[in-house]
């Protein structure tokens, strides 16, 4: 797959990145280099290789999945200018 200037501009637009005409050429080259590397990765034979999440053999610590309120509501609103029943009070912004 090859990236052309139109694709570079479209990607920049989708990413909300301003790209000048001078930057399009170098970006096109960089994106094509990235895609070429990804194509090389696709050629690697991974048959029989187990998926892994880390390069070191470690287990994730597990804990019980318990729902609670955190017990810190009063600490959280302690520095708020105005509160009521552990809720932040803010000025009305919509009529």
Swiss-Prot record:
Keyword Ligase recorded: yes
EC numbers, comma separated: 6.3.5.-
GO molecular function: asparaginyl-tRNA synthase (glutamine-hydrolyzing) activity; ATP binding; glutaminyl-tRNA synthase (glutamine-hydrolyzing) activity
Sections of the chain in a coiled coil: none
Organism superkingdom: Bacteria
Broad EC category: ligase
Keyword tags: ATP-binding, Ligase, Nucleotide-binding, Protein biosynthesis
GO aspect biological process, one term: glutaminyl-tRNAGln biosynthesis via transamidation
Catalysed conversion reaction: L-glutamyl-tRNA(Gln) + L-glutamine + ATP + H2O = L-glutaminyl-tRNA(Gln) + L-glutamate + ADP + phosphate + H(+); L-aspartyl-tRNA(Asn) + L-glutamine + ATP + H2O = L-asparaginyl-tRNA(Asn) + L-glutamate + ADP + phosphate + 2 H(+)
Function: Allows the formation of correctly charged Asn-tRNA(Asn) or Gln-tRNA(Gln) through the transamidation of misacylated Asp-tRNA(Asn) or Glu-tRNA(Gln) in organisms which lack either or both of asparaginyl-tRNA or glutaminyl-tRNA synthetases. The reaction takes place in the presence of glutamine and ATP through an activated phospho-Asp-tRNA(Asn) or phospho-Glu-tRNA(Gln).
Subunit-structure text: Heterotrimer of A, B and C subunits.
PANTHER family found in the cross-reference section: GLUTAMYL-TRNA(GLN) AMIDOTRANSFERASE SUBUNIT C, MITOCHONDRIAL
Similarity section: Belongs to the GatC family.
Protein's name according to its UniProt entry: Aspartyl/glutamyl-tRNA(Asn/Gln) amidotransferase subunit C
Organism: Methylorubrum extorquens (strain PA1)
């Amino acid at each position: 797959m090859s990236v052309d200037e139109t694709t570079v501009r479209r990607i920049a637009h989708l990413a909300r990145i301003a790209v000048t005409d001078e930057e399009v050429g170098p970006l096109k080259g960089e994106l094509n280099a990235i895609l070429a590397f990804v194509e090389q990765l696709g050629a690697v034979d991974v048959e029989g290789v187990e998926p892994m999440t880390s390069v070191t053999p470690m287990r994730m610590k597990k804990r019980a999945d318990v729902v609670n309120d955190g017990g810190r509501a009063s600490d959280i609103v302690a520095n708020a200018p105005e509160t009521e029943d552990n809720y932040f009070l803010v000025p009305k912004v919509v009529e």
